[in-house]
Every structure is written in C-alpha cells, then in structure tokens.
A protein has these predicted regions:
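A generic fold-level signal
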Residues: 2-3, 14
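C-terminal scaffold of the Radical SAM
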Residues: 3-5, 26-47, 52-233
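Short metal-coordination and nucleic-acid-contact micro-motifs, chiefly zinc-binding Cys/His arrays
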Residues: 8-11
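Local cysteine-cluster metal-coordination motifs and their immediate loop/turn environment
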Residues: 13-26
C-alpha cells in the first residue's frame, strides 16, 4: 500500500483532574477500566499493521495519569507491536506533579525521547483558576528530575489570554519559561470551547478575559521575546 503513515498518535483519555478550558476527549480516571482500555488499545494497534514509524505521539487526556505499572505495560507493548527501527521522535505528554520517580524510570527505559509538559502558567493562583492540579515548584522539580534522568528534549505548553491575566503576568511566564533552558515552547491563546467550565461561565457572564487589543499585545510580545532568544516561530 502506498502512502502509508510514518507517524501515529495514541490517545490516553484519562485525567486526574478536568481543566476548565479543555474540550478534548477525556474522563476522570477514578474507577475507570484503565487496564481494559490499554488492552483494547493494543488490539487496535495490531489491527492497523503500521509500517516503521518515524514519529509517535502519546497524548490525552493525560498519559502521565497512568500508574507506573500501566505506563510500563503501554510502552513495553508498543515496542513489541510497532516497528521502531526508523523512529526519530517519540513524545509523551505529561503533567508536572504526575511524573514520579518510578514513572520517569519507566520512560527512561523505553524508546520515548521527548517529553511535553502541560505547564500552562507559572502563576499558582492562575493555575487554580484554570483548574490545574500542579503548582509552580512542581514544574521545576519535574523538569530537574527529567534532566537528571537524561531527558533534554523537553517541551512545555503555555496558555495566554487567560481569565484576569495581565501583560505583566505574561512577561513573567515567558521569562520563567526561557530560564528553563529547554529546546521547545508551545504557546496558545485561550480558546473557549463548548462543554467546558469556561464556556459555561462565559454564557453566564462570569468569565472576564483580556480584550482583543491586550491579547494581540501579548502575542506580539511573546513572539518578539522568543525570537530574540533564538526560538523560531512555526
């Protein structure tokens, strides 16, 4: 078969907490049949008979919400079922605070070579305001632990134009992101989606977002500051 894929995405729909802005396919992990899901996932992987992959991305949900044993099962089975002989990049999403030492050890012995962390903001009050479960100190602890384990291809996600967010807070977030000395940053403006806490609040007039001019100023600052530090916008 021609034009067979060389990239694959695998979805882990479980979360330890549901963020107020997220409309991705996800469920709260407590009392969910996680092991059954992982076994069914492996059956689907076998069904597709994928060719040698160049990139593999495991997202969610929150893949790091899995226990160390479940994560080990997932990654070990993927190595059995998929051809990694041409693999260049294997990314897994994680949340700061979720990546315990035993989970990092599981990642280290696997083929995974890139970690994408859902930081979103460094501001502790804002983290609570958007429904995140980690705090600023856990961001640094997680990245230090990953680097100590030999992971240097680390990316973080940041969201700007959050409810009540100021330009000064964006400046602070960018400065702290740059200080991490990591090779990749993903920054997104907040987009309100249906069936989220934030959209429900917006419909009731209870969500106060930065205006369009302020959001534009935030974007221009982020782009300029990151380019100054050698990052390429794409």
């Amino acid at each position: 078969m021609q034009n067979r894929p060389t990239s694959a995405y695998i979805h882990i729909p479980f979360c330890t907490q549901i963020c107020y802005y997220c409309d991705f396919s996800k469920v709260f992990i407590k009392n969910q049949p996680v092991d059954d899901y992982l076994k069914a996932l492996m059956e689907e992987v076998r069904h597709y008979e994928l060719p040698a992959l160049k990139t593999l991305y495991i997202g969610g949900g929150t893949p790091s919400a899995l226990s160390a044993e479940q994560l080990d099962y997932l990654l070990t089975q993927l190595e059995h079922e998929l051809d990694f002989s041409q693999l260049e990049e294997f990314t897994i999403e994680a949340n700061p605070g979720d990546l315990t030492a035993d989970k990092i050890a599981v990642l280290k012995k696997s083929a995974c070579n890139r970690i994408s962390l859902g930081v979103q903001t460094f501001d502790n009050k804002m983290l609570k305001r958007i429904g995140r479960s980690h705090n600023e100190s856990q961001i640094y602890e997680t990245i230090d632990s990953l680097k100590a384990a030999g992971f240097h291809n680390i990316s973080i996600d940041l969201i700007y134009a959050l409810p009540g967010q100021t330009m000064d807070q964006v400046v602070d977030n960018v400065a702290k992101a740059l200080a991490l000395d990591i090779p990749h940053l993903s920054l997104y403006s907040l987009i309100l989606e249906n069936h989220t806490v934030f959209m429900n609040r917006q419909k009731r007039g209870r969500l106060h977002l930065p205006g369009e001019d302020v959001e534009s100023e935030m974007f221009d600052y982020i782009l300029s500051e990151l380019e100054k530090h050698g990052f390429e916008h794409y």
